[in-house]
Structure formats: C-alpha cells, structure tokens
Regions:
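A residue-level marker of the well-folded mature domains of exported/periplasmic proteins
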Residues: 20-22, 27-354
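Sec-dependent N-terminal signal peptides of Gram-positive bacterial secreted proteins and lipoproteins
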Residues: 2-22
Length: 354
C-alpha cells in the first residue's frame, strides 16, 4: 500500500498560532572608493552580512562581478539590525546613492517599500531587487527563485537517505513567499520519497520563531525539544536562525541539519546538505548585463524567475558538501533531470501563511 507523509499536529498548531490569524556608525564596508565613489552597492537584508546564507551569497555575487571588472564596491547595513524599519532601509539606500553607486543590489522582500521610494527619487540609478518582484519602475529589475524546487530536493534526498522524522523551521512568520515555497517544496519532496520507498515519514514544520530571521533562545529551545523527541534532521530556513539550530544540534549525539540559500556545509559538520539557490551567480549575471548595456532591453522593470533550467536551484554536490550516507549524487542527478524535463511536477502555489 502506498504510504503518504504524515505531518504532525505541531505543523497545524504552529500555523494556528502564527500563520492563521544599537546601531554602530561604522557598519559598512567594501573596497577603497575612487574620487567618484563606489560604483556597486549592496544594502543588506535583516541579519548580518556574513550570515553564511542570503546576505552573504548576494554580496559575494556583487563582489565577484566588481572585482573581475575593476569596479569599486561597498555594502551598507540598515540601522537597528533585525529591527530595521523602512526608514532605516531608506537611509541606507540613500547613503549608497550619495556614495556614488550607479547600481544598488537590495536582497530581501522587506526592502520593497524603501526600494520603491529611493528608486523613484533616483531614476538615474539602477536597482536589483533580489527575492523581489517587478515594481513598475524602469530602473528596477527583480530576481526570484523557484525555492520549492530546492526544498523538494532537500526533503526527497533526506528521506531517500533513510531519515523518517524530519523538522523544518522557516523564517518570515508565514509572510515570506520564498520561505513558504521552501517549506512547501520540502514537504512535497518528503512525500514523494515516502511514496517511492513505501514508508511513512513524520514531519514537524514551524514558522513560530522566524519573524526576524534571527537566532534566539526560544528557537534553540524549540529545536532542542524536537531533537529530544526523535527528530533526526531539521531544515534551518532563515538566515541567522541557523545558529540556533546549530546550537541545538550540538547538544545531541546525531542531530543533523539542512542548510539554505548557499552551501552551508562549512557552518557545521552536522549540515548534510543545503537547499541551494544560486544567489551569487544570478546577481553576477544581472550586474554583467547592466555593464554590457543590456538594461533597457533585458532588465528594466522585469522579473527573472529562476529555477532548475537556469541551474539556479538544487543541492550542492561537491565532495565536502554531500554528506548523505546512501543517497548518491547520481540518484540526485536523476531526480533533478525529471524535475527539469517536467516528469516530476512541484507545486509552487502556496498561499501566504499569515
């Protein structure tokens, strides 16, 4: 008999609770600017620049582009960290423009209102909205990803590798479309593998402590409880939230982690894989098109929605990053090809969970 994924009651409890209803002056960095200022700027999302994930992956793409083209670059962090307001983001973006930026990369959906304000003020400056959407402005281009694909691969691979009790903690408190797609794909991947293996898998999914994408003692306590109650691997989807999951896993003998956004294998030997999206590559490509004079023809007021066909989603397969016991890279390539050619269809139509 075909077995289906069993999602624990905690999944629905979390949805009912959450889904249904000292800044420092010198917080910026980069290369030495010229008399004309910094050409390429990144205004970070909530959390730290070196978060091993979303901010860092975006910034690394901008750095790679700038360095290979001999351009100066700088990053700007909005005041108040994870509690940054739209006014804080506007101030950081204005600072980037005043510093001479000709193009500003703004990762994160929370940037939308500030980005629209500053882009309207500065029509001569170009803006790249990562994890965003078209804003109806010719000087803004947006990049989004099929996160459900990466989530699917992570859930599928974990179950195929023998894990039967999985968890996932997701940022955005149910309002972040990217995190929602990661979660939706993760559950679909687990379910597909459970059906293929004719087994039952239990999953506990939470958006409870991810509103600010930050590490917290509350999140660490929650994940510690999951591991204590038998959860074998937890998908840590939300910037610095990974640090809480790492701390909880370190208290266990065998607790494993799935990372997100970038290859997070270097963060901990407990990370068995990462639901990857090619942030650095897609940012680099977009900036290259701008430099080549293709903005008006290919980027102005456009949304680039990237996935397996663009090699923008998936799992990292480098030797040190692949830490499954029995599920092989060849098996992964087989299921990747089936998603790419449409043999396996992954639903992306998940509602806002707020």
């Amino acid at each position: 008999m075909k077995k289906l994924l069993s999602v624990l009651l905690a999944f629905f409890m979390v949805f009912a609770l959450v889904g249904c209803s000292n800044n420092e002056d010198d917080n910026n960095g980069g290369t030495t600017g010229t008399e004309d200022g910094y050409k390429v700027a990144v205004v970070t999302d909530v959390g730290q620049l070196n978060d091993g994930g979303f901010n860092q992956g975006t910034y690394e793409g901008a750095v790679a582009f700038a360095e290979k083209n001999g351009l100066s670059y700088k990053y700007y962090q909005p005041a108040n960290g994870s509690d940054a307001t739209d006014d804080d983001r506007i101030a950081a973006m204005r600072q980037a423009v005043e510093g001479g930026a000709e193009i500003v990369v703004t990762p994160g959906f929370l940037q939308a209102a500030a980005l629209e304000t500053v882009a309207k003020e500065n029509p001569e400056v170009k803006f790249v909205f990562v994890d965003g959407w078209a804003l109806g402005l010719d000087n803004v281009t947006a990049i989004s990803y099929h996160e459900e694909e990466s989530g699917f691969f992570a859930g599928y691979a974990a179950v195929m590798d023998g894990y039967t009790k999985l968890g996932g903690t997701f940022g955005g408190a149910g309002t972040n479309a990217a995190c929602n797609r990661f979660a939706y794909g993760y559950v679909q991947g687990m379910q597909a593998a459970a059906a293929e293996l004719d087994t039952t898998v239990e999953a506990t999914i939470s958006f409870l402590y991810g509103g600010s994408f930050s590490a917290s003692t509350e999140l660490q306590t929650q994940i510690s409880g999951w591991y204590t109650n038998g959860t074998e691997v937890v998908f840590a989807c939300g910037g610095s939230m990974l640090q809480s999951v790492k701390a909880a896993a370190a208290e266990t003998e065998n607790g494993k982690i799935i990372g997100v956004d970038t290859d997070q294998s270097a963060e901990s030997d407990r990370v068995i894989t990462s639901a990857f999206k090619n942030l650095s590559g897609s940012v680099d490509l977009t900036l290259t098109k701008w430099l080549e004079g293709k903005w008006d023809a290919e980027l102005a007021d456009q949304l680039s929605n990237l996935g397996v066909g663009d090699e923008a989603t998936g799992l990292p397969t480098a030797e040190g990053s692949w830490r499954f016991n029995s599920f092989t890279v060849d098996q992964y390539h087989e299921v990747f090809a089936k998603v790419a050619d449409g043999s396996i269809k992954i639903d992306s139509d998940c509602a806002d969970l707020s």
